[in-house]
Design a protein with these regions (language model features):
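Nucleotide and nucleotide-moiety/phosphate-recognizing core
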Residues: 2-161, 169-185, 192-196, 200-206
């Protein structure tokens, strides 16, 4: 028996090189880490959560979640993390039909993310769905059926494919839309300036 609620994977492998190093997901925004915010927003929407990260998994032990490393070597990018999550779902949660992927540097994910992705996919009758805010697509924030994993593995290993959009286009991807104002729900943090803007957004949201 399958479940409509997907497995959620947080792609937490990004390093904050422009912000002194370390895991970006551990940066604090409004008194809480980005990872805490991501998990808090995603947990009610998913059957279970895992973290995709390479290196020492113990650094995420406080989450209580399974930490799954890439099976493709040489840091092959977010598609490798998505494949790791699809493989984990097939092995540990066979009733799960889909995986929803989010990056570990987006602290303001919407609480209706999964519902809108599922709705967009059903309406378009495509296997995949991704988020868009304003006129900007977010291919890593997406819904993936577990049964694309073998094709994804071939694309990564045999073809050296690395671009999410190139892979998604092969299968068909629906788009779920969100407004980008008063703030972008998929705002991500890549610099000290982004972190300062995220603090401003967090303050606005607390006062809303």
């Amino acid at each position: 028996m399958t479940t409509d609620r997907p497995l959620g994977v947080v792609l937490a492998g990004g390093l904050a090189r422009r912000m002194g190093g370390g895991d970006k997901a551990r940066l604090r925004i409004g008194g809480r880490t980005i990872l805490e915010r991501v998990l808090e927003g995603l947990k009610p929407q998913c059957a279970a959560l895992i973290v995709n990260a390479n290196g020492d998994p113990a650094r995420f032990s406080d989450t209580g979640l399974a930490v799954v490393a890439d099976s493709i070597p040489d840091f092959a990018g977010p598609l490798a993390g998505i494949l790791a999550a699809l493989d984990w779902a097939a092995a540990h949660s066979p009733e799960t039909a889909d995986v929803v992927s989010v990056p570990g540097d987006c602290p303001f994910l919407p609480h209706d993310l999964v519902a809108r992705l599922l709705s967009a996919r059903a309406a378009a009758r495509t296997p995949l769905a991704c988020a868009r805010s304003g006129d900007r697509r977010h291919p890593v924030i997406a819904l993936w059926p577990v049964d694309v994993r073998d094709d994804l593995r071939r694309a990564l290993v045999d073809e050296g494919l690395r671009k999410i959009e190139a892979f998604s286009a092969r299968h068909g991807v629906a788009v779920a839309d969100w407004p980008a104002l008063p703030f972008d729900p998929f705002f991500n943090i890549n610099s000290p300036e982004d972190a300062a803007e995220a603090e401003r957004i967090a303050t606005l949201r607390c006062g809303a």
